Amino acid sequence: MTAALAAARAAATMASGSSGLAAARLLSRAFLLQQNGIRHCSYTTSRKHLYVDRNTKIICQGFTGKQGTFHSQQALEYGTKLVGGTTPGKGGKTHLGLPVFNTVKEAKEQTGATASVIYVPPPFAVAAIDEAIEAEVSLVVCITEGIPQQDMVRVKHKLLRQGKTRLVGPNCPGVINPGECKIGIMPGHIHKKGRVGIVSRSGTLTYEAVHQTTQVGLGQSLCVGIGGDPFNGTDFTDCLEIFLNDPATEGIILIGEIGGNAEENAAEFLKQHNSGPKAKPVVSFIAGLTAPPGRRMGHAGAIIAGGKGGAKEKIAALQSAGVVVSMSPAQLGTTMYKEFEKRKML
């Protein structure tokens, strides 16, 4: 960056008057945009950390709190390799038979953990995310709802300028590889190891899709709840890349909702990367078809603003990418089954 600024100053010196200064500004601006592009691209390299399995070692931030205790116990009973947790001031103690540490850095060094799940109240959740990023934990899953959006803008800014840590959430149910690893608050018993990758902005609709794919005998390969906030760490495109490159994932369910442009971006990604005779079947449902403009519908990000973010536009974009859009969340499982049947994949 220093070299570019020096070159810009030199250009300004050589040129006379305002035109020289304008040239310098343009040169500096171009370099900064290029640098930002490089930095932003580095975050995409962390997509690979979304894949978790029985060997993934996890710590819990907010380990000894009520929510942390309950869901850590559930994770252990599911068979997840939870290796410890953090609660500032309680380092050196044990909880649920596992060690408690004061800091994430210490917990990572002592346990070899590569993932962290955060059950910390909203006022302190961003500090917990920042601590995990600074400790270079590969995967951070933040369950907390109600984090101020201004705080998440700062977190997003930090995330986009590094490539070591992948954030899922906040305000999400988490990530699960059925039968192997459960990071989050989803009910483990409805999941069954199988062939469908599920990504969703809605927690409860994720469970609906999971239950249905289990009932029709397809099961799930990996499920990721990306959360319903406007500024989150992982979007549809990140998960789609994992699903398209995963041999165990033969079909994909994408559950979106009104607000933002994540679904449109996903449609564009699918056009580029999931076309032709070997394309994987993708089924989708978009919540909020009858939602009035300007009113937030549950999630902070579920709002139609400025005439954009409506369900009809999202459905049209997905259909143009070859996605089969279900008009009812109750038909996701049967729709996917029919797609498998049509392609002779059963």
UniProtKB/Swiss-Prot annotation:
Record field: catalytic activity: succinate + ATP + CoA = succinyl-CoA + ADP + phosphate; GTP + succinate + CoA = succinyl-CoA + GDP + phosphate
InterPro entries: Cit_synth/succinyl-CoA_lig_AS, Citrt_syn/SCS-alpha_CS, CoA-bd, CoA_lig_alpha, NAD(P)-bd_dom_sf, SUCC_ACL_C, Succinyl-CoA_synth-like
Modified residues (N6-acetyllysine): K57, K66, K81, K105
Modified residues (N6-succinyllysine): K57, K66, K338
GO-annotated molecular function: nucleotide binding; succinate-CoA ligase (ADP-forming) activity; succinate-CoA ligase (GDP-forming) activity
Pathway: Carbohydrate metabolism; tricarboxylic acid cycle; succinate from succinyl-CoA (ligase route): step 1/1
Compartment list: Mitochondrion
Main location: mitochondrion
Recorded family membership: Belongs to the succinate/malate CoA ligase alpha subunit family.
Full protein name: Succinate--CoA ligase [ADP/GDP-forming] subunit alpha, mitochondrial
Species for this entry: Bos taurus (Bovine)
Gene name in the database record: SUCLG1
